[in-house]
Structure formats: structure tokens, C-alpha cells
Amino acid sequence: HGSIIVDIFGGGTVSTERHFITGFYEFPSFRRETNSYARYFKEQGYVVEAMHPIYGAFYNRNTVNASLGFDAYWNYENRFNIYNGWGGYANDSELYSEIVKSLEETNKNGNHYFNFSVTYQNHGPYESNTLIESYIKNKEYSDVTFNTINNYLKGIKDSNEALYNLFEYLDNYDEPTILIFFGDHNPYLGDGTYAYDELGINMDLSTIEGFENYYSIPYVIHANESAKEIFDKDFTGELDTISPNYLMNELFEYIGYEGNEYLKYTSEIKKQIDVINPIYYKEEGEYISSSNSNYQNMIDEFIKVNYYWANNINK
């Protein structure tokens, strides 16, 4: 497990999604076919699918996911409209059950499976006028903050239970399976950072602590027993703090895989610059202002390679 430093707060989820699935630092228009890790796994013979239980046109995912090389993009219109959970859409447990169905069916047909899913349960905004359940003591918080935080934590509890059940299922699944689980951004809990301020959480972006509190998101790389045996790894311990575009690198480095040429190239970049954010870079383990980088030439080259890889399909 470790942390990713994203570049969004309270919304804009596709930024984190697309950094991960492409490995890109800067995005192309996605109006035509582009290289991605989905396409990479497809080239390795995997069935590659994306899932998100809300409408497919949201954030133009219908078009973009096709450009990224997914065989199918399952969304509200073509799969998940049978569910009526959080906000009228599938809960995490229902989404996970659909992932499992596709995993089992694909493996049964003799194929490997790569799935990129985005959950919806516990998406904000959170009820602020009514308290559903209480998880923290009221230390003279405003009613709005107290209600919002507790209602958010209720959603976290439900999502955690669904994730635990998915882990438990995978641990007993015969085929070697790895799950990378991460958040997109920290939650919007009301006006600005008011609720965070009441909780005593430093969100001052001029400080490293505040910057990390604002943009840091946990990730987990989980493997079932079959995968642990194949890779001779226990999948425990703390990994690096990185940008989301390096998450696939982190997995491949851990299991000893090189990946394609782009992944190998970005792994070299990662050795020097493991966090890339408009405010700070993390260079050789130390945060430095993005305007004062010691590796600006490397960043400039990365942008050029990024552009070339995005616009030249490896067919």
C-alpha cells in the first residue's frame, strides 16, 4: 500500500482515472485511438473492459474509453440500470458482483481478464441537514460539519464492507488475480475546506503538510494466494508515494515485470521524479516547487515522449 498525489480536490475524477490508465503526464484529446495500459493488456491477449454504474456519456467516457482500447464499457444504460442503490445507481457491492461475473465468464472461456472500474457509492454531496449515523464525537463542531462528516463516514463504512467482501472472494478464487484499488480525490465536504478546518486538518497548500492532506490519496495492491505463489511475493508493506500515472509502474516493478517501452521509460523518470503536480514535484524523495525543478529538462522530454506515445498507436 502507499499514497498517490493527485491534482484534483472534491471533483474532476477523470483526471486521476486517466493518469492511471494511460500513464500520461499530459492528456491528448482522446478523439482518436491512443496508447494506454488497457491497450497494452489487450495486445497481451487479455479481454479488457471498463465499468462505471452511471451514464456512459458522463465525462465523455463512452468515446474516451473506446479510444483507450477497451473491448467494452459497461455503464448505466447497457448493464447497471437494474440497480437502484446510492443516488439511484449501483452500490459498490453490486458493481463488484458484475466484475466477478465478467471475471469468471472470461476465465471460463480460457481468456485473461483486465477490468478498470470506477465506483459511484458515497459520491458527494453529503447530507448536511440530517444525521444518519454518528461515528465521531461532537467536539463543538457546527451542525453542518458534524452531519456531513458522519454521513460521509457512513458511506465509507458501507464501501469498506463491500471491498472486504471482494477481497475475501478473490482470496478464494483459483485464478491468479491482482487488484489495484485507489481513490480519485479527497471528498468535498462543503464550502471550501471549512469542514477540514473544523476538524483541525491542515489544508494550507503553502505547506508540505497541507499539500499532502489536500492531494494525498491511499492506494492498495492486493493479490490472491494464487498470484502470491506465482510471483513469490507476499504483497505486504509500504510502497512509494507517487503520482497516479506511475501506479502501473509500481505494480510491474514489484512483481518484476518490465512492461512495454513507454512503461520502461516512465520507470526511469520515476526514479528521479516520483510525484508530478502543478504545485510541487517530489524529486529523489524531497518536495520542491514545480517552478524550481532540478529536472526540468527531463520533464520537458517527458512531455514530448508523452505526446508521441499518445498519438502513435503501436499496432
Language-model features: where?
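Solvent-exposed soluble domains appended to multi-pass membrane proteins
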Residues: H1-K315
